Design a protein with these regions (language model features):
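N-terminal helix-turn-helix DNA-binding core of bacterial DNA-binding proteins
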Residues: 8, 14-54, 80-87
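Alpha-helical residues within the helix-turn-helix
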Residues: 49, 60, 66-67
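Histidine-centered active-site/metal-ligand motif
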Residues: 12, 61
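Short, Lys/Arg-enriched N-terminal segment that forms or immediately precedes the first helix
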Residues: 1-7
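Short, compact, well-ordered microdomains
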Residues: 76, 87-90
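Beta-hairpin "wing" of winged helix-turn-helix
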Residues: 31, 67-76, 83
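Short, Lys/Arg-rich amphipathic alpha-helical interaction segments
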Residues: 89-100
Length: 100
């Protein structure tokens, strides 16, 4: 993915909120029956509820974030869990700083 596509992924208030919440999932989401908030990520259902959007709309936002390499999905049972790709995000930060 080109840098401009990554910046487009970040140019949405909902996706920025998702990334912010996923940085500290225990502070923003309730405990889950399946999956550890920190190790496995947050169930998409909880993210959709917090944003007050449909699961279909959330799926599109998460598709953009996954394609940008900012989050990683993990399937547990019938649920998809998402967490930040901290190494990729740090690499983007470093690239932005050195590129300016």
């Amino acid at each position: 993915m080109q840098d401009v596509d990554i910046y487009k992924a970040l140019a949405n208030h909902r996706r920025l909120a998702i990334l912010s919440w996923l940085k500290d999932p225990k502070a923003h989401f309730p405990p889950q029956a399946d999956g550890n908030l920190v190790e496995d990520g947050v169930c998409g259902l909880f993210i959709a509820e917090k944003l007050d959007i449909s699961q279909a709309t959330l799926s599109e936002h998460m598709r953009v974030l996954v394609q940008a390499g900012l989050v990683t999905p993990k399937k547990i049972k019938q649920w998809i869990f998402y967490k930040r790709d901290e190494a990729r995000i740090q690499s983007l930060k470093d690239g932005l700083i050195s590129g300016l």
